[in-house]
């Protein structure tokens, strides 16, 4: 997601022609860009509270200039939503440590400091962190479909409810971003940047659903993210696609584990992830051979060799995962539950399952991480209602 630092610049050419733009002054534009730059710096330093504050102020100014429905707002809204998601992760981790609750999925990829309170500021007459808050009566995270689950939720601790509300707020902002970005793709059908952004949004919505263990919704969003990525990337040799296939496989495996069709579909995506990774590995091996022949420096050669080792290890894991899915090896959930039973831990929370999911998602993100370090400048530049994530159907 490092490409988002250039988000505002990448999309100016498209968004500047929006019909609802009110021709802001150059000083207004500079003020917004300065706030976004400050937010980017805070985000890069994992100071997500500061990032939310800066992006929120930029969003205030953008809405006051262009109007709340303008596509001009979508880029800042995306950055704002990503930061809210990271804060939800942080708060979930802090509460999890205090309550002995589950580890965050994203903790597997990043470490976080204990967050401070989000700063308050006004936005269209409301605090910005409350602008997208879901009414608890309508929140499908806090109030699942089944009556028994509703009772459990109502009896949940205030800390747990606060954790869920953080994810609700992030979800609502990201889902609004999805709606705006879908319109941008329709408005600029030839723009690769807009399609990549939409794929990124669906991907993050999928990760959010994995965080709250809503695997069915995660499957839907990650499937859509994969479809968009396949439209803009080389299908045969891009590890971002390998990552996308593996994430979707993970979500499918956990979606109704008793349904054998889900495991079969998961296996297909793991096989595809392995196939893509094998192509990447072959290309990298040829690259190492070429550089050796040209007498490249040892440091560069060592980096390439290290990448090859990581790729081979990941490929081996994917191939083993394929065998497990094909030949009836215990699923990740079954293995965890069996271990919990052996240890007489069935009365405790689902932290072990969440940790296992976290490790699997880490492996998926590692697949994409390898290519993110190697992508060209052009690729890096390119990458730059109201229903909750439990059971919503998206509406544009």
Swiss-Prot record:
Naturally occurring in which organism (per UniProt): Schizosaccharomyces pombe (strain 972 / ATCC 24843)
Classification via InterPro entries: NASP-like, Tetratricopeptide_SHNi-TPR_dom, TPR-like_helical_dom_sf, TPR_rpt
The protein's name in its UniProt record: NASP-related protein sim3
Disulfide bonds: none
Biased composition (Basic and acidic residues): 143-154, 284-301
Gene expressing this chain: sim3
Subunit: Interacts with cnp1, hht1, hht2 and hht3; has a preference for CENP-A (cnp1) over histone H3 (hht1/2/3).
One Pfam family in the UniProt entry: SHNi-TPR
Phylogenetic placement of the source organism: Eukaryota, Fungi, Dikarya, Ascomycota, Taphrinomycotina
Family stated for the protein in its record: Belongs to the NASP family.
